[in-house]
A protein has these predicted regions:
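Walker A/P-loop
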Residues: 15
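ATP-binding Walker
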Residues: 12
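P-loop (Walker A) phosphate-binding loop of NTP-binding proteins
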Residues: 9
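Conserved phosphate-donor/acceptor-positioning beta-strand/loop module used by diverse small-molecule
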Residues: 99-120, 152
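Hydrophobic anchor at the beta1->P-loop junction of P-loop NTPases
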Residues: 6
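Conserved substrate/cofactor phosphate-moiety recognition/catalytic segment
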Residues: 19-68
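Glycine-rich phosphate-binding loop used to anchor ATP phosphates in small-molecule kinases
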Residues: 55-99
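Small-molecule kinase domains that catalyze NTP-dependent phosphoryl transfer to phosphate-bearing small molecules
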Residues: 121-165, 177
Length: 177
């Protein structure tokens, strides 16, 4: 088994799609990378703050090591979160590959207006609702460079269709790193 890194901007449907993907397997794990940040009790820096780089590297490495451990034990594993190539993809990929586990990467894409509307419907930290923060994070997914082939346009799809699109690309080997 390998690890699927499922990414995209806030509000694109990552958590819902990851949950649906987990339902497709007898033994599956869905790790929400964001939850690993909650373990920091003192000294936490919001992950989108430029000063959080070192913290983000540590947290994402730990999340990736956890994902790799589950995959090595035979679980179909999805590590879901905001994983941007120039921010944290490298450290995540290195940790998973160091465990000898195959890794795949999928980026869900939808219009920023649709993602922002979904975020506004949520309850939670008001900082992530800041339109400037949302726009800055979403812009990071506009040009993925060498990882552009890992993008999946989910505009107009419901969650089930998006999960099926990811599963098809994953099974076809198109998302492997």
């Amino acid at each position: 088994m390998g690890v699927l890194i499922l990414s995209g901007p806030p509000g694109v449907g990552k958590t819902t799609v990851a949950g649906l993907l987990a339902c497709r397997s007898e033994t599956a794990v869905h790790l929400e990378a964001d939850r690993f940040f909650f373990f920091i009790r003192n000294g936490f820096i919001e992950p989108w703050d430029p000063a959080s780089h070192e913290q983000n590297q540590v947290v994402m490495r730990i999340a990736a090591e956890s994902a790799a451990s589950y995959a090595a034990a035979g679980y179909a594993t999805t590590l879901e979160g905001i994983v941007i190539p120039r921010w944290t993809l490298g450290v995540i990929r290195e940790a998973i590959e160091a465990a000898g586990v195959p890794v795949a990467y999928a980026v869900l894409r939808a219009p920023q207006s649709a993602c922002a509307a979904r975020v506004e419907e949520r309850e939670g930290s008001p900082d992530i609702f800041d339109p400037a923060v949302l726009a800055r994070i979403a812009a990071e997914f506009d040009d993925l460079g060498e990882f552009e082939r890992n993008a999946i346009d989910v505009a107009g799809m419901d969650a089930g269709q998006a999960a099926a699109a990811v599963a098809a690309r994953l099974e076809g080997g198109d998302l492997a790193l």
